[in-house]
């Protein structure tokens, strides 16, 4: 019997085994069939044909039928295992991008095993409350996640016809956002910041306070059912990672947070898959577990620089500032994985954070990001230098979906008009401030002085607030009206007469 089974294996057929119907050997035939069939028809081929190492790339020769995006396992001479992905195929040559970096790879002694599969990540609802590295491996000393499914990290394409237009406003508790750049559930809106500005504190405050608008002032309910946060850090320092982790733990939301951390001392190339792992997890939580997921991606500038490094190693023709010409497309594959889908209650709201090099908003990274996303929140260095927190400059900030998320039935009927009037007065106030620097205060008219007074009070009372101050959208609008009462009714030209007669005469508090 054993000889016949062995002969079957040699001839390429499954071994014929007796089929026990009960006892510990039940199912042994199925197991033998599965094991033998897998490796006889599709063997995993191992190669020791590394012909060169260039930056994060490994070039292999004499590879049989390599496939684009196939996952490769590399075993180094000391037994260390690394994984990579086929980036380019040319005949029997394959270019493999190694996620953990190529340091220590010996061209003669490194063996490469082609798996025949694409990069999939294990996903489960148990990932909430856990901390992973940039490759998706647990680093919180907890057990390996028991996967409910293995999903392609590039995500599933969503039929545009099945997308739902975002219409539910998320109340962040920050007046500069809620009052003038309202965020809808399912929107993608980045924070444009720069080195040394408190963008992490703003993102943490949004995470703490985000929830749906409560229809009544009387009900104070900050709980949010089915709410989850997926946080992905790329190239951040340990201080930033620790800040977010401790903030989530202190406000008791760590059980609803999944963290992916690629630190500054981790391989650069790993940053290319970190946001995709995070978004794949978010899609599982949103569309299969039907949770409302907020995805924070920081820092997208580190991601773009990793992309430039791979492009340079492949000797591709560079675009603006050395970034690859396909960076727009590549960023879109990340940002477009936000939104809502018909037939599913879950949603994905994305808030990517990017630091503008040299505070330059025309740099390719913020420039291309602004084309793809639905607005931006602009963090301003001048406001920060004047000790205003959050230093959000509302003039270059924008939310393209604000119009559909506010108004009667969603926030309040005067919301859009108040926002427009505040924008207009603040813009004129900025012009008056610039004119005052040239001609002096004595040359200003009485109207100009009103705009100057509004400018100062707007920045001190409306924009400025505490890091733990959670204002409702109604409180934000009331503060806006207090500021607008600085002007006589006739100067408020952006607000209809009916709205003015209802809200303007209200007894004003101190402002």
UniProtKB/Swiss-Prot annotation:
Statement: the UniProt record of this protein carries the keyword DNA-binding: no
Membrane topology: Peripheral membrane protein
UniProt: ATP binding residues: 400
Tissue expression pattern: Expressed in brain (at protein level). Expressed in all tissues tested, but highest in brain and in adrenal medulla.
Record-linked Pfam families: ATP-synt_ab, ATP-synt_ab_N, ATP-synt_VA_C
One cellular component term from this protein's GO annotations in UniProt: synaptic vesicle membrane
Main localization, broad class: membrane
GO annotation (BP), single: vacuolar acidification
GO molecular function, one term: ATP binding
Localization per record: Apical cell membrane; Melanosome; Cytoplasm; Cytoplasmic vesicle, Clathrin-coated vesicle membrane
Gene3D superfamilies linked: 3.40.50.12240
CDD domains cross-referenced by the UniProt entry: ATP-synt_V_A-type_beta_C, ATP-synt_V_A-type_beta_N, V_A-ATPase_B
Keyword entries, A-Z: ATP-binding, Cell membrane, Cytoplasm, Cytoplasmic vesicle, Hydrogen ion transport, Ion transport, Membrane, Nucleotide-binding, Synapse, Transport
Subunit structure: V-ATPase is a heteromultimeric enzyme made up of two complexes: the ATP-hydrolytic V1 complex and the proton translocation V0 complex. The V1 complex consists of three catalytic AB heterodimers that form a heterohexamer, three peripheral stalks each consisting of EG heterodimers, one central rotor including subunits D and F, and the regulatory subunits C and H. The proton translocation complex V0 consists of the proton transport subunit a, a ring of proteolipid subunits c9c'', rotary subunit d, subunits e and f, and the accessory subunits ATP6AP1/Ac45 and ATP6AP2/PRR.
Family of the protein in this entry: Belongs to the ATPase alpha/beta chains family.
Function: Non-catalytic subunit of the V1 complex of vacuolar(H+)-ATPase (V-ATPase), a multisubunit enzyme composed of a peripheral complex (V1) that hydrolyzes ATP and a membrane integral complex (V0) that translocates protons. V-ATPase is responsible for acidifying and maintaining the pH of intracellular compartments and in some cell types, is targeted to the plasma membrane, where it is responsible for acidifying the extracellular environment.
Protein name: V-type proton ATPase subunit B, brain isoform
Lineage start: Eukaryota, Metazoa, Chordata, Craniata, Vertebrata
Gene name linked to the record: ATP6V1B2
């Amino acid at each position: 019997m054993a000889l016949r089974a062995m002969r079957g294996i040699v001839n390429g057929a499954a071994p014929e085994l007796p089929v026990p119907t009960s006892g510990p050997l039940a199912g042994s035939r199925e197991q033998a069939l599965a094991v033998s069939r897998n490796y006889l028809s599709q063997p995993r081929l191992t190669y020791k044909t590394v012909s060169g190492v260039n930056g994060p790339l490994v070039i292999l020769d004499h590879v049989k039928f390599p496939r684009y995006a196939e996952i490769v396992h590399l075993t180094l001479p000391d037994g260390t295992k690394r994984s990579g992905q086929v980036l380019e195929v040319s005949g029997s040559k394959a270019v493999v991008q190694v996620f953990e970096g190529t340091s220590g790879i010996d061209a003669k002694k490194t063996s490469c095993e082609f798996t025949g599969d694409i990069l999939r990540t294990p996903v489960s609802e148990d990932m909430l409350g856990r901390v992973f590295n940039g490759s998706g491996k647990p680093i919180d000393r907890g057990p390996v996640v028991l996967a409910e499914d293995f999903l392609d990290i590039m995500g599933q394409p969503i039929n545009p016809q099945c997308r739902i237009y975002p219409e539910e406003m998320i109340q962040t508790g920050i007046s500069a956002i809620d009052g003038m750049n309202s965020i809808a559930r399912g929107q993608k809106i980045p924070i444009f910041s720069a080195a040394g500005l408190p963008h992490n504190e703003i993102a943490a405050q949004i995470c703490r306070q985000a929830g749906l608008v409560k229809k009544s002032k009387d009900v104070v309910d900050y709980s949010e059912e089915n709410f989850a946060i997926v946080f992905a850090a790329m190239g951040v320092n340990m201080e930033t990672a620790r800040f977010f982790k401790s903030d989530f733990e202190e406000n008791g939301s760590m059980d609803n947070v999944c963290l992916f951390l690629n630190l500054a001392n981790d391989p650069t190339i790993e940053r290319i898959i970190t946001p995709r792992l995070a978004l794949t997890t978010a899609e599982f939580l949103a569309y299969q577990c039907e949770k409302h997921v907020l995805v924070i991606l920081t820092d997208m500038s580190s991601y773009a620089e990793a992309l430039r490094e791979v492009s340079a190693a492949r000797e591709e023709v560079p675009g603006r500032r050395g970034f690859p010409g396909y960076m727009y497309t590549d960023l879109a594959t990340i940002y477009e994985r936000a939104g809502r889908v018909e037939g599913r209650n879950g949603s994905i709201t994305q808030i990517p954070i990017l630091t503008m090099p040299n505070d330059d908003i025309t740099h390719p990274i913020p420039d291309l990001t602004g084309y793809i996303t639905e607005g931006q929140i602009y963090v301003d260095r001048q406001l920060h230098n004047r000790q205003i927190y959050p230093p959000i400059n509302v003039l270059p900030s924008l939310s393209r979906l604000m119009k559909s998320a506010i108004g009667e039935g969603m926030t309040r009927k005067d919301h859009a008009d108040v926002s427009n009037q505040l924008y207009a007065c603040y813009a004129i106030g900025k012009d008056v401030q610039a004119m005052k620097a040239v001609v002096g205060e004595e040359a200003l008219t009485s109207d100009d002085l009103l705009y100057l007074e509004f400018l100062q009070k707007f920045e001190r009372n409306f924009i400025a607030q505490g890091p733990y101050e959670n204002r409702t959208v109604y409180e934000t609008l009331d503060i806006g009206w207090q500021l607008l009462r600085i002007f006589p009714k006739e100067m408020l030209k952006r607000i209809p007469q009916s709205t003015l007669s209802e809200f303007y005469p209200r007894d004003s508090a101190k402002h």
